[in-house]
């Protein structure tokens, strides 16, 4: 796949893989996922498979990079459909936040800083088991299919 952002918004000619984008506002999410919106910043608008919205919480890896959205803003965006299965939460994500991210209707979560901080730990199996358990609804089998995190 290919990941686009404000600086790099061009898709290589004849590209056939998945396309994602970084977003830092609800407006960017709406612009990215609304197939009726006009041209993208540098040419025809691509069809995005998913977008990352950040920062949802204070960044773990970028010290001083604070969250941008209030709980109320995220709740409203989830209820209105701005946040949906194509929107991946990024920024300050830890396993304990999974229930809240689900309540806001995020389609998934990116655990960058938390994973990076644990790179020297030897309990990866325990960490991944914790994430899987938080992703699996109570009483359901854990059957992550790769297309949706939840």
Model region roles, listed by residue range:
Residues 20-25, 68-88, 131-135:
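Alpha-helix-loop-beta-strand connector modules within alpha/beta enzyme cores
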Residues 4-12, 52-65, 98-134:
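Glycine-rich phosphate-binding active-site loops on the catalytic face of alpha/beta enzymes
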Residues 42, 138-145:
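Short, low-complexity, charge-dense intrinsically disordered segments
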Residues 9-13, 29-30, 71-79, 128:
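Short amphipathic alpha-helical segments and helix-helix/interface helices
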Residues 12-13, 31-39, 43-48, 130, ...:
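CE4/NodB-like, metal-dependent polysaccharide N-deacetylase domain
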Residues 25-37, 46, 83, 88, ...:
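Catalytic cores of alpha/beta
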């Amino acid at each position: 796949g290919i990941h686009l952002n404000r600086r790099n918004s061009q898709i290589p000619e004849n590209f056939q893989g998945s396309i994602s984008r970084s977003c830092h506002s609800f407006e960017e999410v709406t612009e990215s996922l609304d197939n009726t919106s006009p041209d993208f910043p540098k040419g025809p608008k691509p069809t995005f498979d998913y977008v990352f919205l950040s920062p949802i919480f204070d960044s773990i890896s970028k010290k001083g990079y604070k969250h941008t959205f209030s709980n109320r803003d995220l709740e409203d965006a989830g209820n209105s459909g701005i946040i949906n299965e194509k929107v991946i939460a990024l920024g300050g994500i830890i396993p304990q936040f999974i229930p809240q991210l689900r309540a806001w209707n995020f389609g998934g979560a990116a655990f960058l800083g938390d994973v990076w901080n644990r790179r020297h730990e030897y309990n990866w199996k325990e960490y991944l088991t914790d994430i899987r358990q938080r992703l699996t609804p109570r009483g359901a089998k854990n059957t992550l299919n790769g297309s949706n995190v939840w």
